[in-house]
């Protein structure tokens, strides 16, 4: 009798083990179907209920009024980030659905979560060294705006969400300016988890080729020497090698030079407005996958899944080195004297690789218009050695200040600094400080709004040292802190995605006081008589410049702009430096 009971118990245990290995989720990407927002969240809720080492949490709000979720997968039922970090585990953060018309990552991450939790092919061992955090759908509003007509260049899946969010923002331009609640929530999530590796999943239709998936690698030149070396010698080549051993080969993102990949492609430089560029501000290894829109949806999902599993494997296998490289990178960053602001590709530095593409022609006859166009001939695939330009040179760099001073009036900037964990102190009393300031000499603004802003380009400045009145409560920000790159990229006006470029300081570009020629005449005359050296300079300009000599207002303006009457705050950038 006892033997029968034991046998029954063993049989029950075996049945449970076998049952536990079965997938929980029923995904339908093979049918060219991607789940709705509610279906996605329900699937993660099922995994949460089934596995004690997985947890679905609400991690902030989105513009559509629905929460932004994170799904945490650990080796044990521990979800406190500080306790996890104390165990020495690396963190892999995966973001999906930023452009819901590009849903491969949504399906692939669901498949990955289901498989790693049921330990398919021994995947669960990766959790020994790495905790995985998944954002199921980032652009919730866009994913709810579902239609069969949101992606004109994309045949499958049959219905997808929309690129814009509830405020019609492209959220992959919003990570630093944070116009959306989505981005504010993401910034909090990112600072909470401080991911060692970050992946954002996308789809591209920029070119046609034989690959189902392309990769925007971390931009090595953004990183301190130890991390740059780790990227170039280990992470990037290892992931390419692991991917090429699988069903779906990987190619660098096809950032072409002359419209045809055969002419060579460039390493993509991702600005901080993009998720991967934002990650690099904190020395996190940020990257994007770009699935190829013209491939069948099932292949896009499976190739994205292959990349996610490859990345999880690499992150776990190299967890200790990844964490150590970031720590060393921070030390190297804090020792820097100068900081690069702008880059250009180094055309002398390239490697070659075999690219699998299609022959191109500028004489393809359009079936609708009957006119010639550029196109690819899929009946003529090729494998060619092409150049890959992988290195950039610094064009402009700045001396790193010891402190920034930011007046408390600029609350929107301060909110974003706080959100990203910037350390600062406030002045305890009113005081005059000698500081270096920038004056904005020239800039171009977009003629039409770009993601809700009139972005500034072609900025030129000059520096002055001035004594400026500051007040109790103004911010004194030490630059040499863990958030140094974020500070430099956001507060230096000429940095590629600075707060200045995104119009946070535009009110300083307006002049508040003016002169009336009639009212200013007597004051101008008295000033010239009281300042003979300036009078000589003024008369010399009038003698040398005939147009100036004929222009009544221009002459008075010259006196106004070059004397004590001029507004010192006009075009004076509010963030000052102390060295």
Predicted regions and their residues:
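Bacterial N-terminal signal peptides
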Residues: 7-17
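Structured catalytic-domain cores with a bias toward divalent-metal coordination
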Residues: 2, 20-579
């Amino acid at each position: 009798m006892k033997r029968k009971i034991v046998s029954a118990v063993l049989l029950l245990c075996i049945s449970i083990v076998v049952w536990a290995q079965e997938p929980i989720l029923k995904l339908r990407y093979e049918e060219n179907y991607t789940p709705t927002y509610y279906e996605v969240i329900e699937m993660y809720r099922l995994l949460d209920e089934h596995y004690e080492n997985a947890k679905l949490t609400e991690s902030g709000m989105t513009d559509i009024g629905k929460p932004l979720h994170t799904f945490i997968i650990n080796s044990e039922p521990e979800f406190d980030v500080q306790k996890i970090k104390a165990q020495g585990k690396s963190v892999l953060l995966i973001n999906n659905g930023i452009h819901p018309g590009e849903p491969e990552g949504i399906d692939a991450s669901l498949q990955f979560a289901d498989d790693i939790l049921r330990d398919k092919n021994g995947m669960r061992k990766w959790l020994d060294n790495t905790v995985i955090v998944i954002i199921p759908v980032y652009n919730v509003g866009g994913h709810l705006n579902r239609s069969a007509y949101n992606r004109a260049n994309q045949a499958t899946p049959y219905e997808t969400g929309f690129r814009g969010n509830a405020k019609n923002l492209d959220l992959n331009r919003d990570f630093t300016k944070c116009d959306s609640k989505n981005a504010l929530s993401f910034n909090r999530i990112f600072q909470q988890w401080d991911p060692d590796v970050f992946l954002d999943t996308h789809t591209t239709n920029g070119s046609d080729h034989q690959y189902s998936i392309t990769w925007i690698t971390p931009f090595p030149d953004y990183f301190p020497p130890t991390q740059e070396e780790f990227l170039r010698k280990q992470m990037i080549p290892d992931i390419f090698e692991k991917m090429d051993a699988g069903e779906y080969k990987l190619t660098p993102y096809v950032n072409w030079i002359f419209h045809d990949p055969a002419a060579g492609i460039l390493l993509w430089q991702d600005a901080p407005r993009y998720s991967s560029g934002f990650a690099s501000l904190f020395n996190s290894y940020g990257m994007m996958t770009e699935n190829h829109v013209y491939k069948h949806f099932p292949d896009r999902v499976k190739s994205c899944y292959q990349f996610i599993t490859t990345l999880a494997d690499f992150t776990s296998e190299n967890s200790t080195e990844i964490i150590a490289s970031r720590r060393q990178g921070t030390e190297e960053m804090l020792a820097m004297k100068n900081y690069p602001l702008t880059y250009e590709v180094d055309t002398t530095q390239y490697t070659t690789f075999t690219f699998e593409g299609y022959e191109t022609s500028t004489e393809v006859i359009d079936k609708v218009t009957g006119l010639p166009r550029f196109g690819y001939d899929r009946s003529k695939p090729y494998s060619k050695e092409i150049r890959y330009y992988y290195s950039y040179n610094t064009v402009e760099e700045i001396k790193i200040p010891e402190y920034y001073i930011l007046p408390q009036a600029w609350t929107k900037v301060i909110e974003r600094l706080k959100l990203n964990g910037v350390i600062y102190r406030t002045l305890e009393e009113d005081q005059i400080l000698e500081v270096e300031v920038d004056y904005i000499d020239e800039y171009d603004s977009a003629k039409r709004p770009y993601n809700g802003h009139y972005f500034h380009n072609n900025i030129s400045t000059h520096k002055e040292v001035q004594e400026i009145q500051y007040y109790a409560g103004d911010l004194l920000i030490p630059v040499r802190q863990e958030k140094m790159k974020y500070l430099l990229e956001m507060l230096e006006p000429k940095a590629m995605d600075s707060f200045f470029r995104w119009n946070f300081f535009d009110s300083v570009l307006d002049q508040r006081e003016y002169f009336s020629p009639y009212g200013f005449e007597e004051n101008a005359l008295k000033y010239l008589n009281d300042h003979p050296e300036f009078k000589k300079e003024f008369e010399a300009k009038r003698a040398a410049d005939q147009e100036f000599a004929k222009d009544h207002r221009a002459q008075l303006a010259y006196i106004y702009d070059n004397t004590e009457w001029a507004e010192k705050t006009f075009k004076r950038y509010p963030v000052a430096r102390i060295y």
